[in-house]
């Protein structure tokens, strides 16, 4: 009987380890998705100095089909258009910044743990990234002047306090 108990405990421990590794992989893939989406949108639409042309017509069909800017795994066909989903099974919403010189990307349906991890993404890439604000659950948690930001220092404590719902959302602001 003791051997069976030990084997059971070891099996449960192994299952927990595998589950944690799988969750870390999904967060890593979601991190890649937001970075790839941002990089692709900025690369295609930044030439005119604003992102107004991105929002002409059906933005999701443009991102997934016409310009093929969104990573394929994020594009989910819905009727005659598309919706975007991230690897953590939540929605992805694109929006205009207040002045149309930038855009926002919102990841929805995030657990507290995943919200905290994604809010602390390191945005330094090729010496410059054009992120200037982050909101968690529609509340601004960080804002920087519109200049090249080399890092985005949101502490784990700030993230943990802000990611206080069962389902959280993060909105990143880019220009």
Predicted regions and their residues:
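Periplasmic/extracellular, small/polar-rich flexible segments of pilin-like filament-forming proteins
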Residues: 47-175
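N-terminal single-pass transmembrane signal-anchor helix
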Residues: 1-26, 30-33
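Long, contiguous hydrophobic alpha-helical segments, chiefly transmembrane helices and signal peptides
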Residues: 1-2, 37, 118
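N-terminal alpha-helical signal peptides/signal-anchor transmembrane segments
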Residues: 21, 30-52
